[in-house]
């Protein structure tokens, strides 16, 4: 039995702020339990719900030197869906109403503590992993500590580490002097070939330098981050380590996202009866959001953080023109104020055509995936993207820009070969996006049978975690040897 431990800053169902939690909570369930024992370790935030805290039992505790203090470290344990979770507890480190704050120094301190405490806890929980699988900058110090601080102990000798980059933009940077003091690492770690990058200490860089293998969340993104445009200052290092770098596309939980059993949607449906049943969800959503009741009008959905990365500057530029077309547009999400206000304005101006929902609701997101005809994702960059996978699962045709995971998961429609699962454009250009939306409109209105075939192919595609899990298993086997 090979043993793997995921170390991360969040994981469903205990705590979630984004797609990272879905990966950490879903992937371990799908890895073959006959050959692998996969467990998860995350912080015990005080903002975890009481219902979830009640599932935890105390395992043990110890004290650890950190940042010139002797800190308490509690270890809690819980079982969920057949997976063992461990929680690192320290009230002062993990207090607050949210898992993350906007104070970068606070975040760097908190996750430096978590990295050291998580490794220090292993001998006490009677679990010696063959591989520690780290996720994003919050666990970037784990491979560093493992190689340089813990390898002297017999227990840790030979443990391998994997660093998964979910979004290279976030790196955990702070000034060298402070990070040196917090981590207790000596001077020779803070050089350009180790943790120092552009005069700052960089926690993600530490993980990339010291991990035995590096993964990211799609094949295309793995190639993109080796270029200056997408590399966020790390492209040189990633090119140097390209033999150890691989892309593995994320999956989605096919039990949670299943139009046949989804409790949030008005009318359940499947790949066989969607032609009759999906339209009922459209009517229900139009009624709920106060849009004009019209079965035939193309309904375009957007569920996203409203930021530049997600392509909202393109949408902002073209929104007036889109509203002149025979379409309805539903938006769900929060983000930059300029985009929130832009959508509010168009909701006011075209009240029966545009519905701006500037908040987040799990229930409404499911209703949008089920009700819409098309789903728009014109991202500037997208490491993997999960929304397009949910759209495909629900028979909602994605319109995307060809970048990262969007390029890997949405096959562009080809009317001559009658193939493809969505529509895509390659250049980051508002007019090219608009031309692609209009092309999709044309197929939707003039060639309904073709449109339904696109839906058929999208719903038949398999982006469940089981496909990704096999690739992770191959990597663990390769590492363990």
For every predicted segment, state its role.
Residues 1-481:
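Catalytic cores of nucleotide-sugar-dependent glycosyltransferases that transfer UDP/GDP/TDP-activated
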């Amino acid at each position: 039995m090979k043993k793997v431990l995921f170390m991360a800053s969040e994981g469903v169902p205990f705590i979630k702020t984004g797609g990272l939690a879905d990966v950490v909570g879903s992937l371990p369930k799908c890895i073959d339990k006959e050959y692998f024992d996969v467990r998860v370790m995350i912080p015990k935030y005080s903002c975890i719900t009481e219902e979830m805290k009640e599932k935890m039992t105390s395992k043990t505790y110890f004290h650890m030197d950190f940042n010139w203090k002797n800190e308490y470290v509690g270890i809690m344990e819980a079982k969920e869906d057949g997976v063992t979770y461990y929680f690192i507890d320290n009230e002062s480190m993990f207090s607050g109403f949210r898992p993350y704050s906007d104070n970068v120094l606070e975040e760097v301190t908190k996750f430096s503590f978590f990295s050291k405490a998580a490794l220090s806890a292993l001998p006490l929980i009677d679990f010696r992993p063959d591989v520690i699988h780290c996720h994003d900058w919050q666990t970037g110090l784990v491979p560093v500590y493992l190689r340089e601080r813990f390898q002297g102990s017999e227990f840790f000798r030979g443990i391998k580490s994997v660093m998964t980059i979910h979004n290279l933009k976030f790196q955990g940077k702070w000034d060298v002097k402070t990070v040196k003091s917090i981590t207790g690492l000596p001077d020779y770690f803070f050089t350009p070939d180790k943790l120092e990058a552009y005069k700052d200490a960089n926690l993600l860089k530490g993980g990339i330098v010291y991990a035995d293998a590096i993964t990211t969340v799609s094949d295309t993104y793995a190639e993109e981050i080796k270029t200056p445009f997408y590399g966020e200052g790390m492209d040189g290092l990633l090119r140097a380590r390209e033999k150890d770098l691989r892309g593995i596309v994320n999956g989605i939980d096919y039990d949670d996202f299943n139009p046949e059993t989804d409790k949030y949607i008005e009318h359940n449906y499947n790949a066989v009866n969607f032609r009759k049943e999906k339209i009922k969800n459209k009517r229900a959503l139009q009624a709920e959001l106060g849009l004009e009741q019209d079965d035939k009008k193309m309904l375009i959905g957007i569920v996203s953080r409203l930021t530049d990365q997600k392509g909202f500057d393109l949408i902002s530029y073209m929104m007036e023109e889109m509203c002149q077309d025979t379409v309805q547009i539903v938006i769900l999400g929060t983000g930059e104020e300029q985009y929130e206000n832009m959508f509010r304005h168009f909701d006011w101006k075209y009240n029966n055509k545009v519905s701006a929902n500037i908040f987040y609701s799990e229930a409404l997101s499911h209703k949008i995936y089920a009700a819409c005809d098309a789903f728009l994702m014109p991202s500037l960059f997208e490491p993997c993207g999960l929304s397009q996978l949910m759209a495909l699962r629900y028979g909602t045709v994605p319109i995307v820009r060809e970048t990262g995971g969007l390029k890997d998961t949405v096959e562009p429609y080809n009317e001559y070969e009658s193939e493809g699962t969505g529509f895509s454009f390659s250049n980051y250009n508002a007019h090219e996006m608009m031309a692609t939306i209009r092309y999709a409109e044309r197929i939707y209105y003039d060639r309904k049978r073709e449109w339904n075939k696109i839906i058929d192919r999208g719903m038949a595609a398999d982006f469940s975690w089981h496909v990704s899990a096999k690739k992770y298993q191959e990597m663990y086997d390769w590492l363990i040897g």
